[in-house]
Amino acid sequence: YSYRQDGANTYLKRIHYGNRLSRLGVDRRRPLFLDERRAEATDWNFELVFDYGDHDAENPTPRESHPWPSRSDSFSNRRAGFEVRTSRRCERVLMFHHFEELAMPSGCLVRSTDFHYDDGAIYSFLTSVTHKGWRHTGSSYVTQSMPPVEFEYSQPRIGDEVKVADISDGLPMGIDGTTYRMV
């Protein structure tokens, strides 16, 4: 796998699997860790890519083709006093095959899972997920989609009144997570 770093947050970018050549050592054991340099040098059959809006919409490839966009509803979590900001949103998950012997180009898109959102300035909701099949036709792709799985949410009521929260109101105490009470 590989990932991209954005501040303190880490975003999964790609997963490779189905290596053509064995990575077993001379003692017939798997290496404990496969560093990124060796992973990139390995000839993989399958590549799962997480598209955060940085891949072409009509003719995607395994490599990014656009700048990495920020989401309009970025948010932060704080754990042990550190801010972890989420400023990216996965738009699609792309499955690429690397089988030249099947008369398809290396990095041929075969399937995608597309996420559709209802965007707001303060929040966004996942509204549907669509699975697509892709077939390479030489210079472009032909797609067919399954019916989308759709989601509905109750809308939040955001008021102008500021309320004071107090520990006696049942708020969890501390920042280490040991005194949280699940109800």
Regions found by a protein language model. Give the residues of each.
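Conserved catalytic cores of ATP-dependent inositol ring kinases
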Residues: 1-183
